[in-house]
Amino acid sequence: MTPVVSIIMGSTSDLPVMEKAAKLLDEMEIPFEMHALSAHRTPAEVEAFAKGAKDRGIKVIIAAAGMAAHLCGVIASMTTVPVIGVPINSTLDGMDALLAIVQMPPGIPVATVGINGALNAGILAVQMLAVGDEQLQGKLADYKENLKKKIVKANEEFAQVSFKYKTN
């Protein structure tokens, strides 16, 4: 099985956040790979990964980074494969990572999700891959329909909650 998505993170400490993207890709039956790379500690490996991703069949890269968060932008600067950045909450409540990822110079875009937003990164990757793939579009439609059903169920449960001044 050849991976079409790469999930990249700075270290194993990012895995509890990034496994949300991995679980979604697994659920959608999309082959993916996971690597630990660091823009600061392993720059040569980051360069080799980024420059070789397209030739290896990678169609979307999900990159997570905290603090200075250069990983996403460095990867994006060396490939034409779309990069989705996931800012990791560490110092400054993740705002430093968010701003570092979202404020890319013209010509080097990184699609950025919210702080610790790995699930949305996974969904966005699936949406990118689903362009022109009706089967994958169907899986996405089912996924989103299930989200809707959860809200409908929540409202049914709220209807059973009783308070003296609750009007519905």
Regions found by a protein language model. Give the residues of each.
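Glycine-rich phosphate-binding loop
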Residues: 49-87
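Short, glycine-/small-residue-rich phosphate/pyrophosphate-handling segment
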Residues: 92-138
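N-terminal beta-loop-helix "entrance" segment that forms/cooperates
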Residues: 34-56
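Glycine-rich phosphate/pyrophosphate-binding loop and the adjoining helix
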Residues: 129-168
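Glycine/charged-rich beta-loop-alpha catalytic/anionic-binding loops adjacent to active sites
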Residues: 3, 30-31, 80-81, 102-110
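Short glycine/serine/threonine-rich phosphate/pyrophosphate-binding segments
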Residues: 14-18, 42-46, 65-74, 93-95, ...
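Glycine-rich phosphate/diphosphate-binding loop of Rossmann-like nucleotide-binding domains
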Residues: 2-41
